[in-house]
Swiss-Prot record:
GO terms for biological process: intracellular protein transmembrane transport; protein import; protein targeting; protein transport by the Sec complex. May bind 1 zinc ion per subunit. It comes from Cereibacter sphaeroides (strain ATCC 17023 / DSM 158 / JCM 6121 / CCUG 31486 / LMG 2827 / NBRC 12203 / NCIMB 8253 / ATH 2.4.1.). Its EC number is 7.4.2.8. Residues 846-864 have a biased composition (Low complexity). This is Protein translocase subunit SecA. GO terms for molecular function: ATP binding; metal ion binding; protein-exporting ATPase activity. Keywords: ATP-binding, Cell inner membrane, Cell membrane, Cytoplasm, Membrane, Metal-binding, Nucleotide-binding, Protein transport, Translocase, Translocation, Transport, Zinc.
Length: 908
């Protein structure tokens, strides 16, 4: 009997069905326009683009009104440039993306082409469109491939990748459509907000982004902060000493919670720890583990414990070239340049005996959650998003629409087979692989870690089954292994690397076969080679289809159903036959951690024999419920963390906005004056309280403060003795004196130089104060959770204190800027000559030694902004000796944004 919900869906359709139905009329209009656009010449297509741009940018026509014509033009452009005519379902996907949704499209449905439609339409507004990919290879490939379509339509394409020059990046962002990775977009946003002038900024705004593999970037990577950092003090010796203590710990000294991936010391552990730290001298005599002074060493020991108990080699990381390379748990790929924060990475380096890199100080940071919420409109594509639809809507305001496939999915998804032990499961897996291999059916075996993929490989070697292994160790051969994975009888063991972005074609990859054949015989005629290989491929593909298509075999369930669905999605592309199954055991991590006891009792009751597996829909439902609970818990964690992140994000936007305003303003003397007056007000309130008499004023303290902050030797004691002098009179006289002082400085430096000095000091001080503030907020964040024990809401406490800290930072900023401007002065003739001699000596020494030298000391006002270091990238101090002859009116090579004569070429 049908339930009421099922009956209603049969009559009215699902919400997704209604969304799909709502755009069919638009697709029909695009199809009706097809003959009109097919009749256009190549130049006519470009002219249509120019016409659309005028209608949007000058005529005020909406993009929605223009959609049918723009999509029809884009379809024709793609047909001429690539020989590909977009299917109706691809047009649907493009419409949903333009409307600010996530289009869930299965493997092989042509998502790359789909993105061109909304990208083209939105680029007509002239504000730039960003197409976001998960790695640099895909960004370059898609930009080159789809760039042909945009060129046919008369639009420019740019691609952004690491280590480009500022000019190259600026040109890429200025293009109509820009391809880039999520990492590079985020880092460029941070770098732009550390620039000295607006002209140096690369990005031109955040109008519309299309995010490929959107669930990976906005869910899996959501909490990953992008950090631009600089080096701090080297404490490698401390990490090494702490690491030697960890193996001495017994099980009763700590408590490991696998569900939350957390490890904490017990009371016995703390006592043992204090004793050993005192013995090794890491804790000073007479100091307790609970003293505030012990916070740092306790933090390092905790990180050492986490490194040993929660991070395992070949699971969470691998060791390569004297480095710890982290592995993405969702994709199984190495994450180059990614480091764990708070000293945890250094603790792992000490554990593995590799070189310990110094910790880094955060200069600027942003999470993907907050970066992508900067865009006016956002769209995304993936093969798996439905299970996270609630999170996409709540956090990003993105709806999820499942786009129908062009051909029905012919893959058979079998129920999970559950064994009692891992040994029995592995026996079942090997038997199943052997059976499929003998029938000629290609098999993709999904594992969750490197060590498990290699353990299974050993079992297959013992069984005499030829196979390939794809994991982070063999990532260089990825393209070849994936190309061969669909061949007759092929067996491929892979970590989660094969779960996303890989297109396994039945019978193998034709293009790869053609390339290999031509490489082996360069004299062969390409057309003849292609014709022969295509004929052979068609025959092999039919044989693979007869064998059942690609068999995807999962060896464990992941915490997230999405990752499992991604693995299944490798099979059954574009209507091809296929099969998927998961082989599990009660010893698997997910089963063990999330309650295999009940299932174990059921299996015992059924009287299962050795090597038997239970296969039943009930088991699947139980597992999916467990996964849904884990997903809900992870969502709650991400949602709660986002509330904390939003506090910093609001402050970041305020600071970056203020910074941009300063860069855009030519004359900052008024801002500097406002800051000066505020500092004077604060000093008077502090030393001459309201409603107090002159004999109650702290004249001595006020005199010192005025000298220190304003650089003025004001006769405050004399003023205080005058009749009728109150706080307002003192304020007015100090303001006048400070204004006279700054006017004299401007005359001494020259107006242009003074404006440049004010801008540089303001920007440098903002950056320095923001760095300190980030560190303070990190410390507050790490301890505020304990307020919950006192029945106080940690989030409310964090908001209140973070706001107070922000106000304190702004106050400190005003004081520092005022003080620096008061101290800056032109150099005397003797100082100028001494500096020039030192500079020339350095140049001669550098030329003789052919080695870089540190730049000469400079006055505060003329010092260049330090170059931030990105973790994993090399950045050094600017070296004037290597610049050669620089014209005095040219931009300074240090990158400060000033002319050379006002920066490193200053004679004063």
């Amino acid at each position: 009997m049908l339930g009421l919900g099922t009956l209603a869906r049969k009559i009215f359709g699902t919400p997704n069905d209604r969304k799909v139905k709502s755009v069919r009329s638009l697709v029909a209009r695009i199809n009706d326009l097809e003959p009109e656009f097919q009749a256009l010449s190549d130049e006519g297509i470009k002219q249509k683009t120019a016409e659309f741009q005028r209608r949007v940018q000058e005529g005020g026509e909406s993009l929605d009104d223009l959609l049918p014509e723009a999509f029809a033009n884009c379809r024709e452009g793609a047909r001429r440039a690539l020989g590909l005519r977009a299917f109706d379902v691809q047009l649907m996907g493009g419409i949903f993306l333009h409307q600010g949704n996530i289009a869930e499209m299965k493997t092989g449905e042509g998502k790359t082409l789909v993105a061109t439609f909304p990208a083209y339409l939105n680029a007509l507004a002239g504000k730039g469109v960003h197409v976001v990919t998960v790695n640099d290879y895909l960004a370059k490939r898609d930009a080159e491939w789809m760039g042909k379509v945009y060129a046919q339509l008369g639009l420019a394409t740019g691609v952004v990748y690491p280590f480009q020059s500022d000019e190259e990046k600026k040109a890429a962002y200025a293009a109509d459509i820009t391809y880039a990775t999520n990492n590079e977009l985020g880092f460029d946003y941070l770098r732009d907000n550390m620039k000295a002038s607006k002209e140096e900024m690369r990005q031109r705004g955040h109008f519309f982004a299309i995010v490929d593999e959107v669930d990976s970037i906005l869910i899996d990577e959501a909490r990953t902060p992008l950090i631009i950092s600089g080096p701090s003090q080297d404490r490698s010796d401390l990490y090494t000493k702490v690491d030697k203590l960890i193996p001495e710990l017994l099980e009763e000294h700590y408590k490991l919670d696998e569900k939350t991936r957390n490890v904490t010391f017990t009371e016995e552990g703390n006592e043992f720890l204090e004793k050993r730290l005192l013995e090794t001298g890491l804790l000073p005599e007479g100091q307790s583990l609970y003293d505030p002074e012990s916070t740092t060493i306790v933090h390092h020991v905790n990180q050492g414990l986490r490194a040993h108990k929660l991070f395992n080699r070949d699971q969470q990381y691998i060791v390569r070239d004297d480095e710890i390379m982290l592995i993405d748990e969702f994709t199984g790929r190495m994450m180059r340049g990614r480091r764990l924060s708070d000293g945890l990475h250094q603790a792992i380096e000490a554990k593995e005996g590799v070189s310990i890199q110094p910790e880094n100080v955060t200069l600027a940071s942003v999470t993907f959650q907050n970066y992508f919420r900067l865009y006016e409109k956002l769209g995304g594509m993936t093969g798996t998003a439905a299970t996270e639809a609630e999170e996409f809507m709540e956090i990003y305001g993105l709806g999820v629409v499942e786009v129908p496939t062009n051909r029905p999915v012919a893959r058979a998804d079998e129920h999970d087979a559950v064994y009692r032990t891992a040994r029995e499961k592995h026996d079942g897996i090997v038997a199943s692989i052997k059976d499929a291999h003998e029938r000629g059916q290609p098999i993709l075996v999904g594992t969750t870690s490197i060590d498990k993929s290699e353990a299974l490989s050993d079992l297959l070697k013992t069984a005499g089954i030829p196979h390939n292994v794809l994991n982070a160790r063999q990532h260089e051969q990825e393209a070849q292994i994936v190309a061969d994975a669909g061949k007759l009888g092929a067996v491929t063991i892979a970590t989660n690397m094969a779960g996303r972005g890989t297109d396994i074609q039945l019978g193998g990859n034709v293009e790869m076969k053609v390339m290999q054949a031509l490489a082996a015989d360069p004299a062969a005629h390409p057309d003849e080679v292609r014709a022969r290989i295509e004929a052979e491929h068609a025959e092999e593909k039919e044989r693979v289809k007869e064998a059942g298509g690609l068999f995807v075999l999962g060896t464990e369930r992941h915490e997230s159903r999405r990752i499992d669905n991604q693995l299944r999605g490798r099979s059954g592309r574009q209507g091809d036959p296929g099969r998927s199954a998961f082989f599990l055991s009660l010893e698997d991590d997910l089963m063990r951690i999330f309650g295999s006891d009940r299932l174990d009792k059921v299996l015992s009751t059924l009287g299962m024999k050795e090597g038997e597996a239970i296969v039943h829909p009930w088991v699947n439902k139980s597992l999916e419920k467990a996964q849904a609970k884990v997903e809900a818990r992870n969502f709650d964690i991400r949602k709660q963390l986002l509330k904390f992140d939003d506090v910093m994000n609001d402050q970041r936007k305020a600071i970056f906005s203020q910074r941009l305003e300063i860069m855009e303003t030519e004359d900052l003397s008024e801002i500097a004056q406002d800051m000066r007056y505020q500092v004077i007000d604060d000093l008077i309130d502090q030393h001459m309280p309201p409603r107090s008499y002159a004999d109650q004023w702290d004249i001595e303290g006020m005199h010192r403060a005025v000298q220190d902050k304003l650089g003025l030797d004001a006769p405050l004691a004399k003023w205080a003795q005058e009749e009728g002098v109150d706080q307002d009179v003192v304020r007015e006289r100090l303001c006048e004196a400070s204004d006279r002082q700054m006017t004299e400085k401007a005359e001494a430096f020259g107006p242009e130089t003074m404006r440049s000095i004010e801008k540089q000091i303001l920007l440098q001080t903002i950056d320095a104060k923001w760095r300190e503030h980030l560190l303070t907020l990190e410390h507050l964040r790490s301890v505020v959770g304990f307020r919950g024990y006192a029945q106080r809401d940690p989030l409310s406490e964090y908001k209140t204190e973070a706001f107070a800290l922000f106000e304190s930072m702004l106050n400190s900023l005003r004081q520092d800027v005022t003080q620096k401007l008061a101290q800056v002065r032109p150099l005397s003739e003797e100082e100028q000559q001494a500096m020039m001699r030192q500079f020339l000596d350095q140049q001669r020494a550098a030329a003789a030694a052919e080695a870089p030298v540190a730049p000469a000391p400079q006055p505060a006002a003329a010092a260049p902004q330090p170059t931030p270091e990105l973790v994993g990238a090399e950045a050094g101090e600017p070296d004037p000796a290597a610049w050669g002859n620089v014209a005095r009116n040219d931009p300074c090579p240090c990158g400060s944004g000033l002319k050379y004569k006002h920066c490193h070429g200053r004679l004063d």
